[in-house]
């Protein structure tokens, strides 16, 4: 078992062939955020099993070998803490936020959820209905649904384009055997990352994890398990437009293109460009589309970085009668940025804005926990905040021009509409 100090208050321990543990001590708070990331999610699903990772994430809360669903709910909430989970494209995560004195209880509950769910057929029928209602909620929320459609258009035949929730048909067909097979295949220490941030030392975290049997070496023999491999991502569909009809007050439009993976250093240039393009009230899109033309209330740029690929784009909601005008104006702004990039004072201001946002985003233990876990689950070596700030500061005009020309080219964008005909 090897422990490395990554920064003044940040440490990482890697068990040979086993779990990765990271922590950041924040002595000024009285709480700890702690989570377990399972490196298996929708990117690992074949189409017929779409949604199985998300359904399993729900089902572990229905009961374990030691706790009922109500006992799980009360275990931390009764102490003022919180317990939650989510499924992304790359990982399934379970996390808690508790008083520092309640960290042993939090780790016990999280371990119980990940290791010992009972996965009963009777619970599946109930929770299946809950997930079907979650799908209904997305379909009743057009500014969510349009993003689902955008991903499907980018990757129509790959799991990155599948709905994380699944479809009504796939969720309805999933069985407890499907859930148990996924749990046995993916939910084991060598496929997990554990991260904590707050008023806890790394030594204390390791002590508690040792008590929960997280620090043993990898299983051997017939029971040995290997982490499931994600399905390789094919090239995204670029430069196409898809229009979907729905009776809505607004037309919802997403521009999107594949970009760079989490570990790609070009992500810093993309973050800076996205900020300038649609990151706030001072951004080009906000000023042009909302302030100058009055075409939208919501207009913003977005970036997401996954283990294998990223997505960069723009969302706007506008009246059906102004949708064509809004799309044309956004394309004009894309063309300007792709052609000119960022230079001089504009680049200096954009760097300062991005650096400030990065620092402000880490003001809570939960945010620090998520950041720590992000490195191993996405395959990037640890980068200190100072290193990230330096990477942003070091961006050159040439780098910005290259990234802008490649990823903000209007001809590259896939555009998806959702609204009235």
Predicted regions and their residues:
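N- or domain-start disorder-to-order transition segments that initiate the globular core
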Residues: 1-31
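Short solvent-exposed loop/turn micro-motifs enriched in small/polar/acidic residues
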Residues: 4-7, 227, 235-238
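Charge-rich, well-structured scaffold segments of protease-associated domains
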Residues: 8-10, 14, 25, 69-225, ...
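Active/ligand-binding-proximal structured segments within catalytic/core domains
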Residues: 18, 25-76, 150, 265-277, ...
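Histidine-centered active-site/metal-ligand motif
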Residues: 54, 58, 202, 252
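A domain-level signal for the structural core that forms small-molecule/cofactor-binding pockets
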Residues: 255
């Amino acid at each position: 078992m090897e422990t490395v100090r990554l920064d003044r208050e940040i440490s990482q321990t890697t068990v040979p062939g086993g779990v990765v543990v990271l922590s950041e001590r924040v002595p000024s708070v009285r709480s700890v955020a702690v989570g377990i990331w399972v490196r298996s999610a929708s990117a690992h699903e074949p189409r017929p099993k779409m949604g199985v990772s998300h359904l399993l994430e729900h089902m572990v809360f229905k009961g374990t070998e030691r706790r009922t669903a109500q006992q799980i709910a009360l275990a931390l909430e009764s102490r003022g803490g919180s317990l939650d989970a989510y499924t992304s494209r790359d990982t399934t995560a379970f996390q808690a936020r508790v008083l520092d004195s309640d960290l042993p209880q939090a780790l016990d509950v999280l371990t119980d959820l990940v290791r010992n769910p009972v996965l009963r057929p009777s619970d599946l029928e109930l929770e299946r209905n809950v997930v079907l209602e979650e799908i209904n909620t997305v379909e009743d929320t057009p500014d969510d649904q349009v993003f689902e459609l955008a991903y499907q258009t980018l990757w129509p035949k790959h799991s990155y384009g599948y709905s994380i929730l699944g479809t009504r048909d796939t969720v309805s067909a999933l069985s407890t055997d499907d859930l148990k097979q996924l749990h046995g295949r993916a939910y084991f220490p060598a496929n997990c990352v554990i991260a904590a941030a707050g008023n806890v030392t790394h030594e204390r975290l390791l002590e508690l994890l040792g008590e929960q049997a997280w620090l043993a070496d990898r299983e051997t023999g017939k029971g040995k398990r290997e982490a499931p491999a994600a399905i390789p991502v094919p090239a995204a569909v670029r430069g196409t437009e898809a229009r979907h009809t729905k009776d809505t007050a607004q037309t919802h439009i997403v521009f999107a293109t594949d970009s760079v993976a989490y570990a790609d250093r070009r992500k810093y240039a993309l973050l800076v460009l996205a900020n300038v393009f649609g990151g706030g009230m001072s951004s080009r899109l906000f000023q042009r589309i909302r302030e100058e033309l009055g075409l939208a209330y919501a207009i913003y740029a977005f970036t997401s970085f996954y283990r294998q690929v990223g997505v960069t784009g723009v969302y706007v909601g506008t009246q059906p009668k102004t949708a064509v005008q809004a799309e044309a104006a956004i394309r004009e702004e894309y063309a300007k940025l792709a052609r000119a990039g960022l230079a001089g004072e504009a680049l200096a201001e954009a760097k300062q804005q991005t650096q400030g946002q990065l620092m402000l985003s880490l003001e809570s233990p939960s945010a620090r926990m998520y950041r720590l876990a992000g490195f191993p689950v996405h395959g990037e070596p640890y980068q200190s905040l100072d290193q990230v700030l330096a990477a942003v500061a070091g961006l050159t005009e040439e780098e910005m021009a290259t990234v802008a020309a490649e990823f903000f080219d209007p001809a590259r964008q896939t555009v998806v509409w959702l609204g009235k005909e």
